Amino acid sequence: MASAETEARLRLLPKVELHQHVDGSIPAEVTWELMRHYRLHPVETLAEMRTRLELQPEEEGTLLAYLDKMHYPLWITQFYENVAKVTEAIVDAAAAVGVQTLELRYSPIIHTFAGLTPRQSIRAVLSGMNHASRRHAGMRLGLIVIAMRQHGPHIAKILARQAISEAQHLHARVGVVGFDIAGPEKGNPPRLFKSAYEIARLGHLGLTVHAGEDAPVDYVWEAVDRLGAQRIGHGCAAVGDPELLRRLARDEIVVECCLSSNYHTGAIKRGTPHPIQRFLEAGVPVAICCDNTTVSRTDSVRESARAAEEIGLEAVEAAHRAAEAHTFIHPETALRESDGE
């Protein structure tokens, strides 16, 4: 548990969030409000709704239980206005705890069941981010589009093209800044998505890959060698391969460390140190990230405090300063107020 002094210092620290999912970060009260608006009543109270959205202690340890918490938000994020609304709420919550640079990530394909196209789904998130940016002057915002592994390489290529169409460097507003694959790793190795990543690279999007969270170190190697990853999401498996650590350090490939989430999903076993310290000792750059603020009952201050218990407060402050150099957000448009959606 962080001291009050440490928490206050971290709250004032300009923080950089490079790995946060929209679906798992919608404030519970916003989901509850929209559920009631649509007369959806899976539970009777907000307190009960929280237990459905937030991972409970007895549920920790498996990725399946963790991902199941995304089920209820999907009920209400199939409509443009709702997606924009929840995105605004997420940005507001991040700003409230001192996040200065925020990259949200989002899988548009799973928000198309009520008729939105993937492009409209992407635009809905960007609309929410642009509206929120007007309230938070100086906050840097960008969106990473996710292709889900289980949907296959062809859909990933389609989404890469859709992402490029809304790329930040093509618009004078908050836009898409990166491309990612997520979802079940086992049976879906990164090499299958090489063509999609080549499209994203040619479109000047930043490249990050969920790898080594629930799969062996080979998947991290593939993300680096075959997909050209500039950042690795989670990357827990990499810590056991000295050669890979040297490669990550040499090429300054950032590991997006999500401490609470890694323990919650079982990627790191309870009672064992998080690999963030080993990454730093090997010279691998790290970013301290929330993953899913609602599911993991966390925020950037809490994650930073948790990391401070592993690596020390000064190292946490240094990590946030260094992470700014690895954001995919383009500086020439990052702070410009939007005139449109």
Residues covered by each model-derived region:
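Metal-cofactor-binding active-site regions of metalloenzymes
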Residues: 1-205, 213-222, 226-231, 237-254, ...
